[in-house]
Amino acid sequence: MQLTFRLNWPRLSALCISALCIAFLAVGMAVWAGPVRAEPLRPIFVLNSQDGDVSVIDPVTFKQVRRIPTGKEPHHLYLAPDEKTLIVANATSNSLTFIDPVTAEVRRTVPNIVDPYHLRFSPDMRWFVTAANRLNHVDLYRWQGAEAPDPLKLAARIHAPQTPSHLFIDSQSTVVYVSLQDSDEMMAVDLATQKVRWKIKVGKMPADLHLTADDRTLLVALTGDRFVEAYDVSGQQPRLVKRVETDKGAHAFRARGDKRHVFVSNRAANTISLIDTQTLTVVDNYPGPGGPDCMELLADGKTLLVSSRWARKLSFIDLPSKTVVRQIDVGRSPHGVWTLDHAPRR
């Protein structure tokens, strides 16, 4: 018995053409739509120290969409361990403002936190540390959680004259380093014992601190000079390794996210330097208009946000071209700047 199959060529051709059209249409729609983001960009926050509020910037339109009242003199901000709470420190109001970093809604205000100028969480999420700039002490709090009735419990108050400015905690959560701005000193506090390990003289008006990823080299920005001092802190006592010349008024740090390079804002010179922490040399320079202060690096690694303290602006610096590509009007004396869509901080 012989079976005979007869193909309907006109019908088969029509089906093939239809399938090809559908495939090309799908590809075309994908190309037209472009890459799909897992989630939209989150707001950019800028603290306006003299206005007592926070500017919320839309990262798509680059417009200031609202101002959030906080307390008097908000200077610095930090993300809580749950990554759902952005904490703004209101220095002269003795309070903290908890903000949702995605919706920019205020969640709560925590009172009775004395003179919180600068703040840090320990990497193990157990310690919350504040520098009382006006009152000459460093406070060590036990973190209870953002939703706890009393999120912070004071464990120790460390006398820290004169004018504790900035803090940095090592990756093992064992020591907090403190710059003492008006006595030209730096000290280390042991978190286990809540005692001062050491205190040393440094250069003029030390401000921000940055510890390298290996916990070995501590950088100290000297706002009263044009240098960053590098100390080896791996031993019992710190040892000055090098003074790195950047530019006048070296003030704040922001890591590039590669565990090697660090930006430093030179406030008096209106410049920003990039330091190689392995060679301890300046490897690049960028413009920083209007008295550059705090910095944030966007997740693309190409855009540096800078609070222009004297110009009441947030400046956007395109790193590949070394140009200021945008400036947004914010409030008076803009200081801390932050967004959830940032590059790594070490």
Show where each model-derived region lies.
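N-terminal secretory signal peptides that target proteins for export/translocation
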Residues: 1-14
